[in-house]
């Protein structure tokens, strides 16, 4: 299985929940957690944060070293922090923050690349992957 397979799973999950944002966490080529819709009225639970919390619970750990986060959109600062603090090894995302803003979603214009460059524990980033599909 490859990046395309897992990104398609994130896209499918977003669409299944009637949402634009989806996230999948993979370890050892297996899906550990996925999320696509946040609870109504709770802005803390973006697809990425939900998937991270589910993965930590499933693996019974606070660290996700060796895991890859696939997200249909570039993680916002909150979601990037969650990935960073749990030691996710890699983030693969499709649409960019600028794409999200262009389509009317409220965003703080601080990119994952900017945050990553200033972190002490860098995450491997693969940006704009399957951007058009996302």
Task: Report residues per predicted region.
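Residue-level recognition of the N-termini of beta-strands and the immediately preceding loop/turn
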Residues: 21, 65-68, 123
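A structural signal for isolated positions on well-ordered beta-strands in alpha/beta enzyme cores
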Residues: 24, 68-70, 90-92
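A short, polar/charged loop-to-alpha-helix boundary motif
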Residues: 40-54
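Helix-adjacent hinge/juxtasegments
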Residues: 53-86
């Amino acid at each position: 299985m490859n990046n395309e397979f897992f990104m398609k799973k994130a896209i499918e999950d977003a669409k299944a929940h009637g949402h634009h944002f989806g996230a999948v966490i993979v370890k050892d080529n297996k899906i550990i957690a996925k999320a696509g819709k946040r609870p109504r009225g709770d802005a803390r639970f973006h697809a990425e944060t939900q998937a991270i919390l589910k993965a930590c619970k499933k693996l019974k750990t606070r660290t996700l070293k060796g895991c890859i986060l696939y997200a249909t959109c570039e993680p916002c600062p909150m979601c990037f922090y969650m990935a960073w603090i749990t030691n996710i090894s890699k983030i693969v995302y499709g649409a960019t923050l600028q794409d999200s803003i262009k389509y009317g979603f409220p965003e703080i214009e601080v990119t994952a690349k900017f945050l990553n460059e200033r972190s002490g524990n860098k995450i491997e980033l693969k940006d704009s992957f399957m951007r058009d599909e996302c």
